[in-house]
Amino acid sequence: MPAETVVFGTVFMDCKGFAAYRYDPLGRNVGSVRFIHGGVGRNVAEDLASIGAKVSFVSSVDDSALGLEVLNRLKNEGIDVGHVRRAPSSGMGLWLAIMDQNGDLAASISQMPDLSIMDEIVRSEGESIVAGCKNVILELDLNDHISTTVLSLAKRYGKKVYGITGNMEVILRNRPMLGGLECYICNETEAGRLLEREIPTREPEAALALLRGYVDADGLKSMVITMGEQGSVYYDAVSAESGFCPSIPTKVTDSSGAGDAFFSGTVEALIRGFPLGQAVGYGTRLASWTIEVAEPTRTLLPGNLF
């Protein structure tokens, strides 16, 4: 059976250091270091599969033992990897991250994969991939050509597109592309760059007013701003539904996968027909479950999300 949702995104190999005690950026820190499968697109594909979605992943990996390990894990989760290409080098990105004693990100450096590999997949197979699915999830900051081509194909074939942020650069150069999304989800830092002002995370009503104003002025359909432990605000311009969703108190082990999990839970709920406010609640729950573990995804969930 064809996948209902296609995810266009990256694979990274994460090298994470977890500080055992208070993190000192200028000194030596005792803790543990782990290599973990990551990447926004990969995380989202795995998150979606864990909550029952039928997913196909479009990406690239290295033609190496690590690349094969990534593919096998995705296959074992029931994800279609027929559109993941193996490249001699630079098929995957690298992310060096330091997590402080509370499990929050303290510092990081990332190295992007060679996006020309995915560019070629989109050129040669993009039309058939988009035509054959029901929904598209797009990591928006791959490059201008990939993002605009996928959005154009989705519009041609009447597919809904849900966008997640990588690093904002493509979005800031192509702001009108957000109007082609069914829903755009970003965090308060990304929203601040987009709106060109700081998001008042401790004042939900003020944050919501900014969100409504931006969405209406720029013609977006719906948008969600996540604000970490301060919760999230959401606005659906089509139904006029808006509101604030509090976070769930959680013992944090690793917060780095929270945004991808929130996105995945929210989008899958929207695909299943839930209104935005309810969908954001499901996203919040999945993020809460995910940050309890020392990986960016949680394949064995403590219960059913829906």
Describe each PLM feature range.
Residues 128-129, 176-177, 216:
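Structural alpha-helical scaffold elements that stabilize or flank donor/cofactor-binding regions
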Residues 48, 187, 259:
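Short, conserved phosphate/pyrophosphate- and ester-handling motifs at nucleotide-, phospho-/glycolipid
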Residues 58-63, 82-92, 166, 224-227:
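Beta-strand->loop->alpha-helix junctions that form or flank phosphate-binding loops
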Residues 1-79, 95, 251-252:
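Glycine-rich phosphate/adenosyl-contacting loop at the front of the ribokinase-like
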Residues 135-209, 230-231:
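Conserved beta-alpha-beta core of the PfkB/ribokinase-like small-molecule kinase fold
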Residues 86-87, 97-135, 140:
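Conserved phosphate-binding/catalytic loop of the ribokinase/pfkB sugar-kinase fold
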Residues 1-6, 29, 170, 202-306:
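Conserved phosphate-binding/catalytic region of the ribokinase-like
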